[in-house]
Amino acid sequence: MQETRKIALIIGGSRGIGRGVALRLARAGFDLWLTYKGNHTAAEAVRAEVETLGGACELIPFDVSSYAEVEAALAERMENTSPDVLVYNSGITRDNLLMWMSREEWDAVLSTNLDGFFNVTRQVVFAMLKAKRGRIVVISSTSGQVGQAGQVNYSASKAGLIGAAKALAREVGKKGIVVNVVAPGFIETDMTAALPKAQVLPLVPLNRLGTVEDVASVVHFLCTEPNMYIHGQVIGINGGLVM
C-alpha cells in the first residue's frame, strides 16, 4: 500500500522565504497547498519546481487580509482533509517614520501580516483539532523582537505574531498541535535587496546576510522532527544580530 503523502499549507509561498520553505518541504516528501496573492507567474514556477521534485502543488490564490476570501478558499478543502503543516509566511512592508506614516500604510501592513494570521489560522486550527495533530510555524522577524525605526507598523505586526503564536501554543498543545515561531534577521530576498550591506554587515557577528535556505532548514526541522518537544518558542535566525 502506498503511503499517503503529508500536506503542507504554505501561506505566501511564491517568492523568497516562502518559496524556499516550499521547496525544502517538497524535497522532504510533502505535497503542497501554496497560496499567493497576485504573482501567478512566480507561483506557477514554484509549482513546476515542486512537480520536478516528484510532489504535487495546488495553487490557491487569495488575499490573506480578506476573511471572506480565505474562508472561501480553504473551508471546503478542509472539510475532509487537514494539512499536516501550516507555515504562515505572509508579510509586506510599508516603511516610514511614524510621524509621516499614513493610516493606509499602517492598515495595509497590519491587515496582511497580523489579521491574515487570524483569517488563515482560525480555519486551519479547526481541521487540525479534528485530526488531533499538526505543526504550525509562524514566520515573524527580528523587527518583532527588538523593533526597527521606520518600521513601527511592521514591528507591531511581527511582535503581534509572536504573541498570538505563544497564546495559540497554550491553547492547542495538549491537542497534539505544535506551534513555534521563526524570526529571521537580514535574509537575502527581494525585501532586503536595497539594504546597504556595508552598513548592515557590521551589525551581524557572523558577518553575512542569511540565506533562504538558512530559514528553510529550521522550518523543515520544526515541521518534521518526530516527538517534538520545542513548543511555543521563538527561534532566531539572524547571525547573532539579536541575542
Language-model features: where?
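C-terminal substrate-recognition "lid" of short-chain dehydrogenase/reductases
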Residues: 133, 211-237, 242
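Substrate-binding pocket helix/loop in short-chain dehydrogenase/reductase
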Residues: 97-98, 105-110, 136, 200
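Short, small/polar-rich loop/turn modules that mediate ligand/substrate recognition or access, typified
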Residues: 173, 178, 230-232
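Conserved glycine-rich Rossmann-like NAD(P)H-binding loop of the short-chain dehydrogenase/reductase
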Residues: 30-45
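Active-site helix of classical SDR
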Residues: 121, 157, 165
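Residue(s) in the substrate-gating loop at a strand-loop-helix junction
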Residues: 141
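Conserved glycine-rich cofactor-binding loop
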Residues: 14-16
